[in-house]
Amino acid sequence: VGGGINTLEDFDRVLKCGADKVSVNSGALRDPGLIPAAAQKYGDQCVVLSADVKRVNGQFRVFAKGGREDTGRDALDWISWCVAHGAGEICLNSIDTDGVRTGFDLEMLDAVAARVNVPIIASGGAGKKEDFLELFHHKGIDAGLAAGIFHQKLLTIHDLKTYLNENGVEMRL
């Protein structure tokens, strides 16, 4: 569960409603101490850092407020710091590829995977089922996230899962 997570009380609220993991983005940017505090209280497996990342002058930068505000932070440094301080998983959204349907940003994903050793969920860029197959055969990436491709009925979840399973990606059908 994510969105509007700014305090430990917000973690409490969603966990009491049944969430297993809590995703934090802007709340951690405003108060970086939220990551270690939440990890200490609930365990790092519960703390998911969500990062909206975009290239600015060749550098991966962290953005806030739904990708509208450049924080000036280097994304690789920020993500590494958060993992070192208790983020047990990363949800990495590429602003550059989000909604474009040209495939996941493998260069960005590789750069992050080289710096951390926690699960990475890739988000942004899926346009066809082959994009997911490429992602899931890519070293260091644990999961993929997509929305528009399903909302706009370009692909069904069932068809995607069947295709991936037929191509060697094990999953629950």
Model-derived features with residue positions:
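Generic structural signal for well-ordered alpha-helices
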Residues: 11, 32-36, 76-80, 106-110, ...
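Short, small-residue-enriched loops and turns at beta-alpha junctions
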Residues: 4-5, 57, 68-70, 97-102, ...
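A cross-domain feature marking catalytic cores of carbohydrate-active enzymes
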Residues: 1-5, 26, 51-53, 94, ...
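Catalytic cores of alpha/beta
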Residues: 5-18, 107-143
